[in-house]
Amino acid sequence: MKNKVVVVTGVPGVGGTTVTQKAMDILSEEGLNYKMVNFGSAMFEVANEEGLASDRDQMRKLDPETQKRIQKMAGRKIAEMAKEYPVAVDTHSTVKTPKGYLPGLPAWVLTELNPDMVIVVETDGDEILMRRLSDESRKRDLETTASIEEHQFMNRAAAMSYGVLTGATVKIVKNKNGLVDNAVEELISVLR
């Protein structure tokens, strides 16, 4: 029997991973043990097992067909996990590139993953900009508030298309400054 597969997305700096991890910890205390999987890490595991990459940066240099195959295999691997326990997939709905927005979950991944729910973590663009500027542990491209807002809009559009293709519900969770516990509670309410 398949357990729940939930995809959690958000732009860099919105706090999606933090909100998800805190929700997983609380749910675990309640006896609901989700496995949290980073999609990029799952892809790297596949690439590494096949001797195609020894670090995550090398994956970007693989030819597109190989990348697609690795994406598909990672999706299949996560779907297999869902036979054992519920899974929360931490990934990006879209990836902003110099040539435009790249879908984080193209059709061949969605077919394998078949999520039950897509969650988009958001907040105001100016809050994200300030978080990025104050986070010295990460090196991120400098963006304007308008650019961040556009990226969040594209994430919503992509999430809805993922829902159309799979029948997954789409939930927007707001992670406002100083109110992370509210975002965690909102996420928990749909994961139970």
UniProtKB/Swiss-Prot annotation:
The residues that hold ATP are 10-18
The protein's location, in the record's own words, is:
Cytoplasm
Location (main, coarse): cytoplasm
The UniProt GO MF terms for this protein read: adenylate kinase activity; ATP binding
Q: Which SUPFAM superfamilies match?
A: P-loop containing nucleoside triphosphate hydrolases
Q: What is its EC number?
A: 2.7.4.3
Pfam entry (one): AAA_17
InterPro entries linked:
Adenylate_kinase_AdkA, P-loop_NTPase
- What's the catalysed reaction? AMP + ATP = 2 ADP
Q: Name one GO cellular component term.
A: cytoplasm
For this UniProt record, the keywords arranged alphabetically read as follows: ATP-binding, Cytoplasm, Kinase, Nucleotide-binding, Transferase
Q: What class of enzyme is it?
A: transferase
Its family remark reads: Belongs to the archaeal adenylate kinase family.
Self-association or partners: how does it assemble?
Monomer.
Protein known as: Adenylate kinase
What is the protein's species of origin? Methanococcus maripaludis (strain C7 / ATCC BAA-1331)
